[in-house]
Amino acid sequence: MVKTRYLVAGSALAVVVVALGAAASYTANGLPPLPQASAPTASAAPTPTAAPGEPRPVGFAVVGDSITAWAGQEAGSWTSYVGSDGLYFSGHGWARNGAPLAMMEANTPRLDEDVLVVLAGTNDLRSPVALDDRLDVVDAIVRRSGVDRVLISAVPPFDPDPRLGTAWNAALREHASGAGYAFVDPWSGLRVDDGSFDPDATIDGIHPTPAAAERAAEPLRSAIIAAAG
């Protein structure tokens, strides 16, 4: 069964919904699905409070696909590793296995976190939609969220055709600069020279291993804190 995880705004805790669908060998975008796991049981922690005299912790929300949602396998998501004393994942936003950009835009809720992290586009790499039109959807995601401080993340290597991932990441970087978004490439240490994954860092040439997700969380953590100002 294909399991998908949603991150839903609107409560003090994250609400996680697991939807069951017909079994399939590939997603609608031609990408292999994630290995399946049981439904997640944990919710995000309540918003932490700062001790007297200490700065308020930075909260962030996310919009993404399986790189973030990981079909309930918490150890595979970078969000499991990015928190620190001064930073926490609110559990809000939206992420789903196999989601293309248009689906993310349609489901992005209104948010009030300090920073929005958008890690998106892998499921559109083989799309005939022009790069500029895809970037317009990224902007629409940001507008729907209502968050002022935005961090755009590069997508991981895409071994079926590394050139597609490289081109999308270059377009994201340039667009972020012009739009006033922060940008981070947390996967730079997990690629080899042709732009594909280090073989030890991926389960399938598209998704990182849990250890690779943990490595990617380090630059993401620094970039989120910097984006918060």
Predicted features and spans:
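N-terminal export and membrane-targeting signals
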Residues: 1-16
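Catalytic His-Asp segment of secreted/periplasmic serine-dependent ester chemistry enzymes
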Residues: 13-16, 21-26, 162-229
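Serine-esterase "nucleophile elbow" of acetyl-processing enzymes
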Residues: 26-97, 102-112
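Structural motif
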Residues: 59, 115-117, 149
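Active-site-proximal beta-strand/loop segments in catalytic clefts of secreted hydrolases
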Residues: 63-66, 94-97, 119-123, 153-158, ...
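Extracytoplasmic/secreted cell-surface and envelope-processing proteins
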Residues: 71, 125-129, 159-166, 193-194
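Oxyanion-hole/transition-state-stabilizing segment in secreted/luminal serine hydrolases
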Residues: 101-135, 155-158
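Active-site segments of SGNH/GDSL-like serine hydrolases
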Residues: 122-123, 142-169
